[in-house]
Design a protein with these regions (language model features):
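Beta-strand elements of well-folded, non-transmembrane domains
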Residues: 83-87, 120-124, 137-140, 164-168
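Charged, amphipathic alpha-helical segments
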Residues: 86-108
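Exposed beta-sheet edge/beta-hairpin loop segments within beta-rich domains
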Residues: 70-72, 105-109, 146-156
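Ser/Thr/Gly/Pro-rich low-complexity, disordered linker/stalk segments of secreted
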Residues: 206-230
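Oligomerization/assembly interface segments of phage tail-like spikes and tubes
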Residues: 66-90, 154-167
């Protein structure tokens, strides 16, 4: 799908049953956290969210001196996210770290699962498009710390990689796409599908899809950009 721009990114932590963690166990009181551009929330928005491996590898099957079939493997998406800044507490929780009594963030044993929605817009109509991943893990492969100079500052962005896993509500497929212009698309259901159990309700959730649906930007059930306690 031809899209333009990166409007925002939503994330949440999941428990072993696939439900969204909320409050002190999650990323916000509602469970859903928006990586917005509000400095008061510790965020500076995101530059890119590059999605790869949306299709599995293909293997030709030959017989009688001709190609008789093609086998297609399952998709194994990864998303590389480049954010200018993510709230530090949220960042640590996404990476599966827990805080000690002394304040240190230490990697936990096992895997911390999360979910992800990337919101963009269709290139021609400007209607919203959501790339959704109901289950996966976030990792950070490196941290490049450089000195400032007498003429320039050298900040490093928050760079994350999301590796998608099979999601049972989608027949164990790894991703889904929603388009605002589709009459069947209900904004509330997009978030219910990806973040089940969350109290977060995007603005416009009562609209039953379609081109006139208002744009989400708030929560009736809890802030999407106030980190939960720890």
């Amino acid at each position: 799908m031809a899209v333009r721009g990166l409007k925002t990114i939503y994330v949440a932590l999941k428990d072993a049953s696939g439900q969204t963690l909320m409050g002190k166990d999650g990323l916000s009181e509602s469970g859903v956290y928006e990586i917005d551009t509000n400095k008061a929330n510790g965020n500076l928005g995101s530059r890119t969210a590059n999605i790869s491996n949306l299709a599995g590898s293909t293997t030709k099957v030959s017989g009688n001196n001709q190609v008789v079939d093609v086998e297609v493997g399952d998709a194994a998406p990864t998303v590389t996210i480049d954010s200018n800044a993510i709230n530090p507490t949220v960042m640590q929780k996404l990476l599966g770290r827990e805080q000690s009594a002394s304040g240190a963030w230490i990697p936990k044993d096992g895997v911390t699962e999360s979910a992800l929605i990337i919101e963009t817009q269709e290139r021609v109509t400007g209607q919203r498009v959501w790339f959704a991943f109901g289950r996966g893990i976030m990792t950070q492969s490196s941290q490049n710390v450089q000195t400032d100079t007498d003429t320039a500052k050298t900040p490093e962005d928050d760079n994350l990689t999301f590796t998608a896993e099979g999601y049972q509500p989608w027949n164990n497929k790894t991703f889904a796409t929603y388009y605002e212009g589709d009459a069947k698309t209900n904004i509330a259901n997009v978030f219910k599908d990806v973040f089940p159990g969350s109290s977060f309700t995007p603005a416009g959730a009562t609209t039953q899809g379609g081109a006139g649906a208002p744009k989400p930007g708030g929560s009736a059930g809890g802030s999407a950009s106030q980190p939960g306690g720890h």
